[in-house]
Amino acid sequence: MAEHHHTISGLVGKLVTELEVNCNADEYYKIFKHHEDLPNAIPHIYRGVKAVEGDRITSGFIKEWHYIIEGKPLTCKERTTYEDEARTIHHSTVEGVLLDDYKKFDATLVNPKADGHGSIVTWIVEYEKINEDSPVPISYLTFHKIIEDLNTYLCASD
């Protein structure tokens, strides 16, 4: 079951969704760190992803995402950093339509369990709106659907 938290203070906000999964925890971390398989795993959300600056092995590389939110195809470029020890992957948007409404739009995936089955996967979206008219990015809470769909995909390959 997904758990959602939402806080906002003026123009700055944070959205959190957590979901318990029952497949191999390491596979969750790997599929997000080595992102090429995401479009195959969940093509109804991710249409494509590629490294555009640096290589996917080095923390700090930039990748371009093609994805769908609320039925709309979107593209963005993000700088991706990761901490293997903490099993945390951080995406910071550097280009794309998200920056039309937000000065900052960052997404962090936390999957603390290193191996075995079962884990809690957490998505954290932190943002700063350009102005009061910019929407709260509630549609990005649907990332719990990504976690659920990956659970199904990864369990099928266990």
Swiss-Prot record:
Compartmental location: Vacuole; Cytoplasmic vesicle
Domain of life: Eukaryota
Endpoints of the signal sequence: none
GO BP terms in the entry: defense response
Family indicated by similarity: Belongs to the MLP family.
Its biological purpose: Not known; MLPs constitute up to 50% of the soluble latex protein.
UniProt name for this protein: Major latex protein 22
CC terms in the record's Gene Ontology section: cytoplasmic vesicle; vacuole
Tissue: Laticifer.
This protein's UniProt keywords: Cytoplasmic vesicle, Vacuole
InterPro entries (UniProt xref): Bet_v_I/MLP, MLP-like, START-like_dom_sf
Name of the gene encoding the protein in the UniProt record: MLP22
